[in-house]
C-alpha cells in the first residue's frame, strides 16, 4: 500500500511541477528542465538585410512619437483622429498615420458592456502601437506628420469605414495610407499608395511593425500566460520570443520568408501584421528602448518610375484569440492561442467544448457537461482504479499487522506484503495506470479553460458573472475543499501518520490556492471531484454487495 501511495504522490507532484514549468516558460522564464532552443541552437546564416541579433534593423527609424500631453514642438504639429466602428473605438495619430489607440468594445459574445479591452495605446505609462513606413532613403515613415483626407466620416454607419492620411512629399515620394474597417471584423485592411513625384526612379522598402512595452497584462493570480512577440512562417511554424531572450540577444526566429505573419501576443488577445502571401519579406525583432520592443517585417518593393504609383496592401488583425475566427484569417494564426505541449489534446477538447456550448448556450454548463462526458469516457479506467483501491482498503488491517510484526526487518516485511498481495490477487500498482492515462487530459482541459477568451465575461449561474475571474464569494473553492475532504475519507487511511496528516491538509491547501483561480477552472475541478466521489461510492458499494452475495 505504501508503494502505491508513494507512486501516486510522485505522479501528483510531477504533474504539478510540469504545470508550473509550463507556466514558467509561458511567462517568459526559463524552463527548469530544458534549455531554451535559443541557448542550444546555432543561428542559421542570416538572409541579406536580416539577422537574429538585436541590432538587426539598423535602417529603421528609432524615433517614437511623443505620448499625448508632451509639449515638444513636434508633438504639437500632430493630432489624434478619433473613430468608431461596431467593434472598435480608436485613434489614429497623424504622426506617421499610426494606429495609436484601439479599444475593443465587443470582444466576443456574452460579454458585459463595461468589459472593454484597450489593445493599442500610447500614454506616459503604456505603449502599444501598430505603425508603417518606408525605408531605403529619406522617405515618409512613422515619424512624419500626415494630413487626414478632408471630408471623410469617422463613425461607421454602413458596412465599412475608410480613413485616409496623406504624407508630405519626401525623397520624391508621396504616400497615402488608408485604413478600411469592416463591420463585425477584427481585421483592418491597410493600403498604402506610393507615388513617385520626383524625377528619378526609386526603390523603397516598406515596413510594418508592432511596438509595445513589456508591461504585464492584468490577469487573475496563478493564471499568468505568455506576453511578447511571435513569428509564424510555413517553414518554421510558430515561434514565441520572450522579452528576456530579446534582452539577452538570444531570440531565435525565421528572419526571411514569403508567407506568414508577425504578432504581439497577450492573454486572450493579440495583434498581427499579415503581409500579402508570396511577397518576400525580412523579419525583425528588437529592443528599442529600456522597456520597448518591436516585431515587424521589411518588404522590398519594385522600382517606382517618376509619375508611377504602386500599392502595398497588408492586413492588421487586432482582437480576441477566438480559434475559429483566427483559422479563417490566416494560416497558423490560431496558434497565438497557445496550449504549449498539450496542444494535440487541448484543441480537440476545445472543439468539443465549443460544440456543447452551441447546444446549451452557456459556457458554465458546457464545462459541466464536458467534464461529465470525460468522466464517462474514462469510467472503465476509473472503475479499475477504484476497485483496486477498494481491495487495498479491505486488506489494510492485515497489511498494518504485517508492518507491526516485521517492523525491525524491512526485507521480511516486504516479502510478507508481496505474499499477501499474491494471495489476495491484489496489484499494489493497479490504481496507478488509470490515473497516469487521465493526467494529460486533465492538464489539457486546464489550459483550454485558462486560454479561452470565450470565458471572459461569460456568466454561469447566480453569483458567477465571469468565468475568467475568481469566484467573488469563494463558494466554488469551498465546495472544492469539501469534495477533496470527502475523497480522502473514501480512500484507505494511510498507515503512516505523516501521510495521513498530509492527506487531511491537502483540501485546505488547495482551496486556498484555488481562491485565486478563474471560476471556470474551479468549476471544472469541483464537478470532476463530485463525479469522482459518485463513481467511487457506486463502485465500492457494488463490490460490497457482490461480496455479501458470495
Curated annotation (Swiss-Prot):
GO biological process: any one?
Answer: protein insertion into membrane
**Transmembrane spans:** 3-23, 363-383, 429-449, 472-492, 503-523
Residue ranges the record marks as coiled coil: none
Q: Do the record's keywords include Protein transport?
A: yes
Domain of life of the source: Bacteria
Residue ranges of the region described as Disordered: 34-73
Q: Compositionally biased, Low complexity: which spans?
A: 35-73
**Pfam families per UniProt:** 60KD_IMP, YidC_periplas
Q: Which GO terms describe its molecular function?
A: membrane insertase activity
Q: What is its main location?
A: membrane
Q: According to Swiss-Prot or TrEMBL, what is its membrane topology?
A: Multi-pass membrane protein
Record keywords, A-Z: Cell inner membrane, Cell membrane, Chaperone, Membrane, Protein transport, Transmembrane, Transmembrane helix, Transport
- One cellular component (GO) term of this entry: plasma membrane
Query: Where does it live in the cell?
Result: Cell inner membrane
Give the multimer and partner information. Interacts with the Sec translocase complex via SecD. Specifically interacts with transmembrane segments of nascent integral membrane proteins during membrane integration.
* Membership in a protein family: Belongs to the OXA1/ALB3/YidC family. Type 1 subfamily.
Please describe what this protein does. Answer: Required for the insertion and/or proper folding and/or complex formation of integral membrane proteins into the membrane. Involved in integration of membrane proteins that insert both dependently and independently of the Sec translocase complex, as well as at least some lipoproteins. Aids folding of multispanning membrane proteins.
Instruction: Give the NCBIfam families listed for this entry.
Output: PRK01318.1-3 (NF002352), PRK01318.1-4 (NF002353), yidC_nterm (TIGR03593), yidC_oxa1_cterm (TIGR03592)
By what name is this protein known? Membrane protein insertase YidC
Q: Which gene encodes it?
A: yidC
